[in-house]
From Swiss-Prot:
Primary site of residence: membrane
Record-listed Zn(2+) 2 binding positions: 259, 261, 280, 283
Amino acids binding Zn(2+) 1: 244, 247, 264, 267
UniProt-recorded Gene Ontology molecular function terms: ubiquitin protein ligase activity; zinc ion binding
One Gene Ontology term, aspect cellular component: peroxisomal membrane
Gene: Pex2
The protein, known as: Peroxisome biogenesis factor 2
Amino acid sequence: MAAREESTQSANRVLRISQLDALELNKALEQLVWSQFTQCFHGFKPGLLARFEPEVKAFLWLFLWRFTIYSKNATVGQSVLNIQHKNDSSPNPVYQPPSKNQKLLYAVCTIGGRWLEERCYDLFRNRHLASFGKAKQCMNFVVGLLKLGELMNFLIFLQKGKFATLTERLLGIHSVFCKPQNMREVGFEYMNRELLWHGFAEFLIFLLPLINIQKLKAKLSSWCTLCTGAAGHDSTLGSSGKECALCGEWPTMPHTIGCEHVFCYYCVKSSFLFDIYFTCPKCGTEVHSVQPLKAGIQMSEVNAL
């Protein structure tokens, strides 16, 4: 029976990554709130909030604490991940929310601690008296001890997965799921579908360069021309040098390949370099040599186009 309860608790234990993600979400929310708040004073005198920045931040974080931890027993990041705080000092196995004193001490340790650190830094920054120097050394020593304690707590958290922050360990509160978590069934349908599509995409990437798209397009164009019966008009334009047999536009630097049709130099040269067995899409003549077109075209014909 005890082994079954232990396995159930381990199955419902909050993952370390979920607790760390909740902390990161809280930091992102604080940055977003502060950036949006400072945008409200964008048109005011520069440096207006600089003198009272620690107090303003403390007020905003206190406002967030009032409507998150104090009322809902969870931060915003924890609520997103279906996590909440639990009173670890309670012997009752049923969920017990943190007491009012624990919530108040949590606000004092987190909000008050950050405010005190920022305000003391501003206070000691421009003071050079001996008394202030000793107080600054004591403050730095205390901050160093707290940093060391946070490091040790983080190492213990990585090992045991409980108490993500030093404040939670000191106050005796830890993260639990809001609702009991069922055993998740692993399905591979999505993975199989993704592997199938990735394999198909790699096959297309390998196959498409082997297909002569331009030659295939020319074949289809010639078949469509035969089906629509417009070969006489196209041959007239091609033989008169007014239309490229590949792109269908006025030939730029017109060249021939040994038949009566005319090509742009870029069109015929690129097609020939891509396919040494390139043939004319209109009449099927093989390329013997690419020669400039030697023909006289009246300016009246050019203007008529």
